[in-house]
Amino acid sequence: MTSPDTQTSSLYAKREPVFPKRVSGKFRSLKWWIMGVTLGIYYIAPWLRWDRGPNLPDQAILVDLANRRFFFFMIEIWPHEFYFVAGLLIMAGLGLFLFTSAAGRVWCGYACPQTVWTDLFILVERWVEGDRNARIRLLRQRWDLEKTRKYLTKWTLWLLIGLATGGAWVFYFTDAPTLLVDLLTGNAHPVAYITMATLTATTFAFGGFAREQICIYACPWPRIQAAMMDEETITVAYREWRGEPRGKLKKGEPLSPDQGDCIDCMACVNVCPMGIDIRDGQQLACITCALCIDACDEVMDKIGKPRGLIGYLALTDERAEREGRSPRSAWRHVFRLRTLIYTALWSGVGLALIVALFLRSPIDINVTPLRNPLYVTLSDGSIRNTYDVRLRNKQGEARDYQISVTSEADLALSLEGHPATVVTVPANETMTQRVYIIAGKGTPAAEAERTDLRLWVEDLAAGQRVHHDTIFNGRGN
């Protein structure tokens, strides 16, 4: 039993809404620029056209699930070439490690979709309701016509943004103009409507209401980044040695000689989209967006103090400044052993993908020997092996391919259903052709257990040849 005087505490901290104040400065301008570029690419890219010739889609970027292909301008990726996608994912991971090791959570602060869309939603919120103080007053006031009108306007605009976000996503998976007409006329596949509705709801919820909660609780990266950062990593930090002891600045009175440069104006806290105080040190919630730097620099200008009370610096630099030593240059923090290793790995994977892309053949073959039975003895005593040759024509037109065999032994080749050794494969199609290889009675290949051979496939129009090595099974006497 618990006594009436027993106090219980909850492990759950109720969320306090965060209303970032408008701020201007070089980092805010950089965030606006990155937001415009990333959103522009996301919304416009599905509408870009790229002429690939007949029998191929003309959408520049297309994930064609129906035909199991991915198009990116002049590049076409087939299902068996998924290693290109795997390579790109590896490069993305290494790039994230590189940027985090060099400059902290710059991805989170500038280019993460959660950050970009939250910035856009806050921009709409500020345009409808006003700046920070006005939004706080509106939240606290009782529901009336003005509050209802502003909230409905804001939510409607958020829903439209979410709808555009979901719509843009589905446009990447089929021809965008055609799908748009189908969506408007109700003829689109139910999956398209379900996907749009899901993304609209999640964008509306994450960008409008969850915001910083996604970064703190749902995203694993704040916890992973601890292993990527060290004392040489450049990140947003407060120069405590310069700002403390902090104190209020009264109008018309100079700062006390014993007082630090921080006047406890809370400007850095008021502009933070995460609602944290950077003066408390490094925190899991900090996304390194640097808006607190812009806000603090503006205050320092007003009170006649040098900028940089809050800035990008490494912990070793802060320690050096505290001890009166000169900090290292930013480039020496960026280009150090760890970042150079990440750069080398990233470049190596990228170079390997480029080489593989340029060396890949427009003809793809796969040869499967039939194992049951391993060979067949014909009426004249010769030995026949059977193979399934899978041909993939990656061209935009039908091609004739000639199949031949080379070996140290004397072998003959024939095709099932074709009097000649030439087969036609339609454009952008895959076809399986049964091939017979025969060794005459008493020949070395017929009597040996195994004989190496090479199957050749030649594109008669382009003169290109590819081969596949396999074996011929004999009696083994």
Curated annotation (Swiss-Prot):
Coiled coil feature spans: none
Stretches of the chain found on the membrane's Periplasmic side: 51-81, 176-189, 360-477
Cofactor note: Binds 2 [4Fe-4S] clusters per subunit.
Chain positions recorded as [4Fe-4S] cluster 1 binding sites: 262, 265, 268, 296
Record-linked PROSITE patterns: 4FE4S_FER_1 (PS00198), 4FE4S_FER_2 (PS51379)
InterPro entries according to UniProt: 4Fe4S_Fe-S-bd (IPR017896), 4Fe4S_Fe_S_CS (IPR017900), Cyt_c_oxidase_cbb3_FixG (IPR014116), Electron_Trans/Redox (IPR051684), FixG_C (IPR032879), Ig-like_fold (IPR013783)
Compartments where found: Cell membrane
Gene3D superfamilies: 3.30.70.20, Immunoglobulins
Stretches in topological domain Cytoplasmic: 1-29, 103-154, 211-338
Alphabetical list of NCBIfam families matching this protein: ccoG_rdxA_fixG
Task performed by this protein: Involved in a membrane generated redox signal; required to maintain repression of photosynthesis gene expression in the presence of oxygen.
Name of the protein described by the UniProt record: Protein RdxB
Species of the source: Cereibacter sphaeroides (strain ATCC 17023 / DSM 158 / JCM 6121 / CCUG 31486 / LMG 2827 / NBRC 12203 / NCIMB 8253 / ATH 2.4.1.)
